[in-house]
């Protein structure tokens, strides 16, 4: 490059740096002073440009080119200092590598210090966000069996149980359950250590190893597993150990002395044995590992003498299985004499009861849909950009060393394909070994193989590699920043204990508690580890041959016939219709032998008559303060004044200071012949409600309203304080626009909803010093004050998405937002099957298991009554991504399979109805768009109108 060209390119780097510095300094001025005058921003930027050109002319372009990346923020359309920081970090990390700057310590010491600091940070991160207490479902079971040396569900997980039990013996942490949670943080950190070592051993580079390790550490499900009691963290650890031993075998096999390579084969066999002992799914890695070994060393087939040590090591890895028969007669949870028999042992250790779930989705259409979902599973963990980087890294790795690409990429692909066929309720967790393999592809693909030629020009490849490595670190830091609030929130979540205590503390003496698996395990923990209410008998209600709801109803009837008070965690309105009236017990349901005649002690007394029909004698509000994203739980205690007419309905309202309706629920009621009737309401504040004090009002109606004493249709019961949300509302259009009206408000995003074609709705999401809230505008665009734009210069250019564009944004309870469904072919015929995919966003971690119910409807000629319908209810993502796994910012697409009825006509209007409901209680998730709730009661899905044929 000529001297003039060199100066010109260096000046370009200086210009980029100057523009960036000028913009950031101007915006920092605006941050402290409200805004920056255009002339001041111009002067600051001009000085920075001159200084940048002068400074960068001292460096050749091959050293200064990373500064051009600062143009990312120079042209970024919003004032956002976080994005500026990300751009600056990207440049510094790239520049650090381009100029081969060393840490101010000896190289050998740096190779120790960097991973130690990284791993210490990750462990402290997990400790800071660790689940604090008992957990539900499998997590709760693992806490219980670890504390009492019990036997977990098949395959039993004996090695995990023993190691977690040792953890419970350590003298720190408040309770055993906490220490079992901490064990996951330990195993997850060890997995990160193994991943780092594997990448570093193969690439010899610190930064790619650290970048890839941090990506895995902050992946959604990996972080979740690192902070809760589970067996998946150990599954990931054994997968990582297998990959490490095979990588070391790869490095040693070509050396003159084969003994070290043989030792790594023995270590692989041991970890493989321990791995499949822990979880049989790791055997699938063997389908790739064994061909890899043969590819690397074909002579092993001709050397049987080399087999026996690996075989013995593998058999040694199976020794933990002896725990099962040795505990067959122990008086602990899960133990059974059948474990001491060969058939019983094999059935448990091999988990043969789950064999019907494997290879379920092999039918081509279902399998292709599952592959779509597997892509969503990956984007649930990593950003779309990172998933593309994974594919690019696999290409780089295959170019340099196809055998390693076969090992890591093949393992990830095989595990993904097999998981896609598996009817697993939590596919995001089953995929952990695949995430480990993919991260190894990422780190080694970017870091390169020590001593191997690189594709293309070394200079071009090196520059690209440096840039992509820096980009991975920036993505990892962004993942950390975006997900920390969710896991910090879960660190304060005591839902399982609160639920279990609400039942056990109020349960009648010697009651029978019928529980689903989700709630049975934490209740068992309280009883068996903390000795809470051992008089209450807890029975897990497992599925039988009949419909599950009918099993519950039968079990309740049997308990009542046995003269016992019965509590259930599940409720089904149709199946329970013939049972006596229940009363709420926390979130559970109590069927009493004798009706309640006295008001419970935690209720406030009241005497409110609603017409000549109902007298409210007391109430309970669960919490005096909630957030905008929480539900207000109100329980009314009442008695009939006279016999109630059919269809009598109680309602509860949340009412703002100005009298506007902030939340509502109507419940058709039944009454007892004797005693008090209890009705529980869950009031979700509607979007647009602002923080403040709200009244809780109640009323009732039949054919006419039941008027209160003052003649009004509703009467005040209590008040509740509603505070701003701690989480930014989920949005398709994030912004950071600081208003200049002195309010301190910042627009955090906006969304447009055109679900109703003739009634557009605009949501504005605001951030203030107290938290987040939203405003709602129907068929209008508000006039807003000026805001601080790029360079901190005041701007009034408010531009929102066209309100005529197809856009959907329908908030539901618990922070879930429906953002639309896939388009339907215009030409649909009778009998045709349809796949309708719904998209969702999450504002905050979801703490309930929601079922998505999609109903396809053929309307009669009046466009109102139904001629036919088809229903598909499923857990999101065909069970792959349950709502219990969602955190703030999660994006999930869920397919539903419905069919056009054979009786449908070409001119018939066809539509759809989408609702979400609790998998256990059947409670419908509140629809927080008052227009849709009043007109439909569900989210209407447009499929075909008579005009479209």
Give a label for each model feature:
Residues 13-20, 398-401, 444-482:
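Signature aromatic-anchored transmembrane alpha helix within multi-pass, membrane-resident enzymes
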Residues 48-56, 182-203, 241-245, 392, ...:
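Transmembrane-helix motifs of polytopic, lipid-linked glycan transferases
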Residues 49-54, 379-402:
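Hydrophobic, aromatic-rich transmembrane alpha-helices
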Residues 52-63, 200-203, 242-268, 272-275, ...:
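Membrane-interface transmembrane helices that cradle and orient dolichyl/undecaprenyl
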Residues 56-68, 195-218, 237, 257-260, ...:
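Transmembrane-helix signature of polytopic, membrane-embedded enzymes
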Residues 91-102, 250-251, 256, 284-315:
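Perimembrane helix-loop-helix junctions
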Residues 224-232:
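Short acidic/glycine- and proline-prone juxtamembrane loop motifs at membrane-interface regions
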Residues 501-515, 521-524, 530-949:
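C-terminal luminal/periplasmic domains and tails of membrane-associated envelope-modifying transferases
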């Amino acid at each position: 490059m000529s001297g003039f060209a060199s100066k010109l390119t260096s000046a370009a780097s200086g210009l980029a740096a100057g523009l960036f510095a000028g913009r950031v300094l101007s915006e920092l001025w605006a941050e402290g002073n409200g805004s920056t005058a255009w002339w001041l921003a111009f002067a600051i930027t001009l000085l920075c440009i001159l200084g940048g050109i002068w400074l960068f002319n001292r460096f050749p372009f091959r050293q200064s080119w990373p500064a051009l990346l600062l143009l990312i923020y120079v042209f970024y359309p919003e004032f956002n200092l976080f994005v500026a920081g990300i751009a600056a970090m990207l440049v510094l990390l790239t520049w650090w590598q381009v100029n081969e700057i060393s840490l101010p310590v000896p190289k050998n010491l740096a190779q120790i210090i960097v991973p130690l600091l990284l791993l210490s940070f990750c462990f402290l991160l997990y400790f800071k966000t660790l689940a604090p207490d008992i957990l539900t479902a499998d997590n709760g079971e693992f806490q219980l069996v670890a504390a009492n040396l019990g036997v977990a569900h098949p395959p039993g997980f004996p090695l995990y149980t023993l190691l977690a039990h040792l953890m419970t013996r350590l003298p720190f942490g408040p309770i055993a359950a906490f220490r079992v949670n901490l064990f996951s943080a330990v195993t997850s950190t060890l997995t990160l250590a193994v991943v780092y070592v594997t990448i570093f051993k193969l690439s010899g580079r610190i930064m790619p190893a650290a970048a890839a390790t941090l990506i895995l550490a902050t992946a959604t499900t990996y972080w979740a597993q690192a902070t809760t009691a589970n067996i998946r963290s150990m599954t990931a650890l054994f997968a990582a150990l297998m990959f490490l031993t095979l990588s070391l075998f790869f490095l040693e096999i070509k050396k003159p002395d084969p003994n070290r390579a043989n030792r790594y084969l023995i270590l692989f066999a041991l970890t493989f044995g321990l791995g499949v002992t822990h979880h049989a799914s790791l055997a699938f890695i063997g389908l790739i590992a064994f061909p890899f070994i043969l590819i690397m060393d074909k002579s092993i087939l001709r050397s049987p003498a080399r087999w026996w040590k690996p075989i013995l090591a593998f058999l040694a890895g199976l020794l933990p299985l002896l725990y099962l028969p040795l505990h067959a007669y122990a008086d602990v949870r899960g133990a059974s004499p059948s474990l001491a028999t060969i058939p019983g042992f094999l059935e448990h250790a091999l988990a043969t009861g789950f064999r019907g779930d494997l290879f379920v989705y092999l039918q081509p259409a279902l399998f292709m849909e599952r592959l779509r979902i597997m892509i969503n599973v990956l984007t649930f963990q990593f950003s779309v950009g990172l998933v593309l980087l994974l594919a690019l890294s696999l290409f780089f790795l295959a170019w340099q060393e196809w055998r390693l690409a076969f090992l890591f990429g093949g393992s990830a692909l095989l595990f993904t394909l097999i998981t896609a066929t598996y009817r697993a309720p939590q596919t995001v967790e089953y995929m952990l070994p695949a995430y480990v393999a993919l991260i190894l592809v990422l780190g080694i693909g970017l870091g390169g193989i020590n001593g191997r030629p690189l594709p293309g020009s070394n200079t071009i490849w090196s520059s690209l590699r440096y840039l992509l490595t820096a980009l991975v670190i920036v993505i990892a830091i962004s993942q950390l920043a975006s997900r920390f609030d969710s896991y910090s929130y879960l660190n304060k979540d005591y839902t399982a204990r609160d639920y279990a205590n609400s039942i056990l503390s109020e349960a009648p003496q010697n009651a029978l508690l019928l529980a689903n698996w989700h709630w049975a395990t934490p209740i068992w923990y309280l009883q068996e580890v903390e000795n809470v209410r051992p008089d209450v008998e807890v029975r897990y209600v497992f599925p039988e041959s009949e419909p599950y709801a009918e099993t519950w109803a039968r079990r309740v009837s049997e308990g009542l016939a046995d003269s016992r008070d019965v509590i259930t965690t599940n409720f089904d309105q149709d199946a329970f219709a013939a049972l006596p009236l229940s009363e709420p017990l926390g979130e559970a349901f109590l069927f009493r032998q004798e009706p309640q005649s006295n008001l419970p002690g935690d209720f406030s007394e009241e005497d409110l008559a609603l017409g000549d029909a109902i007298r409210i004698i007391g109430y309970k509000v669960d919490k005096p303060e909630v957030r905008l994203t929480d539900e207000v739980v109100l329980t009314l205690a009442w008695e009939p004044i006279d016999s109630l007419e059919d269809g009598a309905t109680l309602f509860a309202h949340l009412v703002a200071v100005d009298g506007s309706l902030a939340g509502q629920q109507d419940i058709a009621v039944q009454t007892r012949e004797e005693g008090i009737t209890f009705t529980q309401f869950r009031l979700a504040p509607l979007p647009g409600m602002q923080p403040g004090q709200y009244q809780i009002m109640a009323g009732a109606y039949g054919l006419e309203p039941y008027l209160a004493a003052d003649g009004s249709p509703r009467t005040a019961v209590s008040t509740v304080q509603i505070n701003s949300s701690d989480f930014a509302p989920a949005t398709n259009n994030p912004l950071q626009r600081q208003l200049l009206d002195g309010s301190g408000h910042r627009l955090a995003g906006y969304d447009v909803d055109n679900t109703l074609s003739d009634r557009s709705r605009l949501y504005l999401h605001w951030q203030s010093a107290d938290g987040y809230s939203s405003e709602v505008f129907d068929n209008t665009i508000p006039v807003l004050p000026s805001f601080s734009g790029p360079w901190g210069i005041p701007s009034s250019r408010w531009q929102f998405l066209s309100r005529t564009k197809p856009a959907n944004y329908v908030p539901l309870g618990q922070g879930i937002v429906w953002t639309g469904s896939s388009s339907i072919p215009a030409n649909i015929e009778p009998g045709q099957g349809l796949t309708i995919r719904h998209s969702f966003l999450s504002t905050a971690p979801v703490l309930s298991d929601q079922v998505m119910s999609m109903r396809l409807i053929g309307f009669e000629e009046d466009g109102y009554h139904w001629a036919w319908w088809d229903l598909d209810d499923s857990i999101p993502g065909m069970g792959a991504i349950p709502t219990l796994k969602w955190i703030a910012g999660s994006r999930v697409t869920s397919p539903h399979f419905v069919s056009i009825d054979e009786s449908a006509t070409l001119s018939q209007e066809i539509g759809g109805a989408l609702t979400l409901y609790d998998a256990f209680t059947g409670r419908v998730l509140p629809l927080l768009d008052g227009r849709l709730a009043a007109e439909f009661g569900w989210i209407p899905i447009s499929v075909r109108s008579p005009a479209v044929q």
